[in-house]
Amino acid sequence: MVEAKIKALRDELERHNYNYYVLSAPTISDFEFDKMMKELQELEAAHPEFADPDSPTRRVGSDLSKEFEQVVHKYPMLSLGNTYSEDEIRDFYDRTVRSLNEPFEIVAELKYDGTSISLTYEKGRLTRAVTRGDGTRGDDVTANIKTIRSVPLRLRGSDFPEEFEIRGEVLLPWAEFDRLNKEREEQEEPLFANPRNAASGTLKQQNPAIVASRKLDAYFYYLLGENLPAEGHYENLQAARAWGFKIPDVIRKCQSLQDIFDYIAYWDVERKNLPVATDGIVLKVNSLRQQRNLGFTSKSPRWAIAYKFQAERAETRLNSVSFQVGRTGTVTPVANLEPVLLAGTVVKRASLHNADIIEGLDLHIGDQVYVEKGGEIIPKIVGVNVEARSMLMGDKVRFIRVCPECGTPLVRPEGEAAHYCPNESGCPPQIKGRIEHFVTRKAMNINIGPETVEDLYNAGYVKDSADLYTLTVADLLRLERWAEKSAQNLMSSLEESKQVPFERVLFGLGIRFVGETVAKRLVSAFHSIEALEQASLEDLVAVDEIGERIAQSVLSYFSDEKNRTLVNRLKEQGLRMAVSEEQLANRSEKLKGLTIVISGTFSKHSRDEYKAMIEQHGGKNSGSVSGKTDYILAGENMGPAKLEKAAKLGVKIINEDAFLNMLE
């Protein structure tokens, strides 16, 4: 009875996974899905004799991998020959005509810009996932791949081969890339340069739980093995779609060279509207027999070629390199350029990321450099026009050894790309940066900006965030541009900030890796600053979404006596360092598992108040309507786009009264 129930839950959850992640057509809410998942987890925990490595519960990525085993590819993962030239596409087509001397079809596909993967299935079950590596051998990343919801652990139907491989691309969607970089920016971690690097780095994470949290996707494009269902590559992909694989629906058969050029021209424009990064078109001879006849060179197949889209690039002069220090001490090199037009905007600066990038480019001041804007959020230098160098070559660019602001020797933690200034208490940009972070709207919401922080710091009035609360009107009036009214306004703003809830105070402290969401998780678990200070590593990592890196950062922060003193001074000034009795009493799980979008203007409460209520009762706020949305809380003047999307997806729209009734 129990075994049958477990099997039924597994089958149903896999069906819903397929509907959501492959078909993009969910049939149940996240709440219902999570409820089923929890039931299955509890049954599996109570009955380990029915364990199954392919269970949907394994997708959450709970196992910690110590290392990746090297695996030899059964079929080498060769690179494709590539070109940026339509003339070379024409040459490829003409060579194929001459070599085959019979009719043939070309299959045109988008070239996805991620990290390549090869999956092995035996009797319909995923048994191994291996990265490209050097083409001959790669890393076994099966545990990480199993966390990707669009990868089938068991195949649908029964007409698949006994054993086969399928090749594909692991991708980080643009929306997830933006979310991840925003989170890293808030925590002053180095940003991912593009979704490809982010996907590759994620897949190599030692902890599958981190992989699961980043919402990777996977598209598949080639099958290998004995007894494939068809003699055509295109037809095999359609069969794989029926087995549960995510096969792009933009694949086309081309009967002529003009068909190919039309496909390239269309997607060179339209690819910008896709949810994932692409960097070209792949062309393959459709017939597997003809592929075998054409064969391979030592490096690539003769029956396929990749056409690469031109990246948006410009050439300009490198005038200088400056180094910026962030609030957590991260030192970032920035190239200062002769202004140049690129992708419709004038570019004056470009990212150099870290010391390894600088060394790899072998930059010299005065070099003519190539600046590119592809999938990146800011322009980057991708190369140097060495031929343009004169005999009077400028100084070689080297990463600095000491902090440009305070002169402290920089450190580079083992395994990290970034350099840091360790002088947290004496480095001006770090001090001012922490204060600027503390006063932001999402933290303490104190009505001053960077210029005022700069003035207060230079005048000697403020050396840390606690000093803000000892300011007087007389202090402010001694500064330029300050009058009685503006000084009183700041005093009022400081007083009002003492009512800011604990999670925002914790976020405002600027602990490395503790963003808004992490701060809320910690406050929900520990309720007071004292409890958080006394928490052990084991206590911290037991909190949902808190990994060892965040836990170590929290422990490091509170082990520093200066930080504990700062917290005590803020507490003495009246800031909230604990969840109030009222907040604890009002918490519930009435909205647990529900995702709610707020739209429009309201009369009974503000939007921020409604957001707080949703979180207080266990719900989740979202800024956009999707298949995961359970309700839209709608006020006056709700956006027409959200209204249209809600109608299309069948999302229920509720007003203020209906929402408040849900909380009673």
From Swiss-Prot:
Catalytic reactions of this protein: NAD(+) + (deoxyribonucleotide)n-3'-hydroxyl + 5'-phospho-(deoxyribonucleotide)m = (deoxyribonucleotide)n+m + AMP + beta-nicotinamide D-nucleotide
E.C. code: 6.5.1.2
The keyword Metal-binding is annotated on this UniProt entry: yes
Names of the cofactor(s): Mg(2+); Mn(2+)
Positions of the catalytic residues: K111
GO MF annotation list: DNA ligase (NAD+) activity; metal ion binding
Name under which the protein is recorded: DNA ligase
Organism: Parabacteroides distasonis (strain ATCC 8503 / DSM 20701 / CIP 104284 / JCM 5825 / NCTC 11152)
